[in-house]
């Protein structure tokens, strides 16, 4: 685990196969960025609540990785999600966990954007990552 500029960076190693790199053509990973502001809670309160939620995220079907994002200066928080495929992403945004995030009164201005992934290029530039 490393901290750079106030951002927690989780280093992963030996995750290339687990992240689906080298998969068959057509099995496209999907990325999602969710951002929001904190509403009436501190960053530490958010961190504690989020820590309690980590088993839920870790068990989401099709979720390859979630990176927790923070920028306290602009009150912007969120997550970068890497999904096994677009179908896994779509199940998530229609499901209970994402709907709970959108309805959470402690979060404001919840926004979500999704992206396709160039798996061939990503496989050439992805550092060896290992969740700790």
Identify the meaning behind each predicted range.
Residues 2-7:
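Extreme N-terminal basic, low-complexity initiation segments
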